[in-house]
Amino acid sequence: MLNNRRIAVVLPAYNAAKTLRRTIEDFPPGIVDDIILTDDASRDNTVEVSQELGLATIRHLENRGYGGNQKTCYTAALERGADIVVMVHPDYQYTPKLITAMASMIAYDEFDFVLASRILCGSALKGGMPLYKYVSNRALTFAQNVLIEQKISEYHTGYRAWSREVLERLPLRACSDDFVFDNEMVVQAIQFGFRVGEISCPTKYFQEASSINFTRSVTYGLGVLETAIMFRLKRLGLAEPGFLDDDPGKRLAGPDFKAPPQKAPVAAMAALAGVAVVGAWLGIRLLRAAFRG
């Protein structure tokens, strides 16, 4: 507990049996009030290890995806009375030793959510991040900052902390169940005016650490750009993306929500229009930035 605010850590897990114990051992003592692990139909003994460690354990019988797993994590944390929720990946890629610092930034009302950036300290490549991922990370972050008009050093970290107010307010049910969930959630928080903070975070890539392959990375990158473009189109009054709709029914605390499928021709036309309008605008901004540099 910090400043009389209850701290919960959520662990969205998939095949994390080999690294879970090491992750928990690095938790700072005396700070975390609740630890919740949601297992997304792992093929190993993640659930058994979690139960041995005494963690509150939730098991998906079918894989719901990375975003779907987080929805379960945050819902459980809210139901169990958390005031601040820190998401830590149980693959030991991010150090849990920053939990106190991240939670403090929210507990003392400096920020509403905090991102742990691997870029601020320049440790990404030193920690083993593949070069193509580093380059794409920087390119995507630059494009996102231009489109969203922010100065965030990294949108793609999996290490985050959120206030209860943010989690109760965002329409998270409307977000993707896949990896782009992370970006949609950040964009939602910016859209609704919440304060974002960052903290420098080392990272490490190793055999047991989870990482998406090249094909899924490309899919993720396209999803990230689409998310930022739709944000810009909404600000320009040219689109009303569902994940940015301020609908109480799409919140985790709201009634069950299932997004209606969008017809393919309509989605395609919206995407083409978005690329045309925002592409021209982004090109101008990039040229201006190049001439300034």
Q: Where do the protein language model's features map onto the residues?
A:
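A conserved acidic beta->alpha catalytic loop
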Residues: 39-47
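Short beta-strand-to-loop acidic/aromatic patch adjacent to the donor-nucleotide binding site
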Residues: 82-93
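Short hydrophobic beta-strand elements that form part
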Residues: 8-12, 36, 59
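A short, conserved beta-strand element in the Rossmann-like catalytic core
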Residues: 41, 65, 93
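Short, well-formed alpha-helical segments that are part of the catalytic scaffolds
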Residues: 14-29
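Donor nucleotide-sugar binding loop of glycosyltransferases
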Residues: 16-19, 42, 95
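Acceptor/aglycone-binding surface of glycosyltransferases and processive sugar-polymer synthases
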Residues: 62-79, 96-179, 206-215, 225
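Hydrophobic helical membrane-anchoring modules
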Residues: 1-3, 149, 174-293
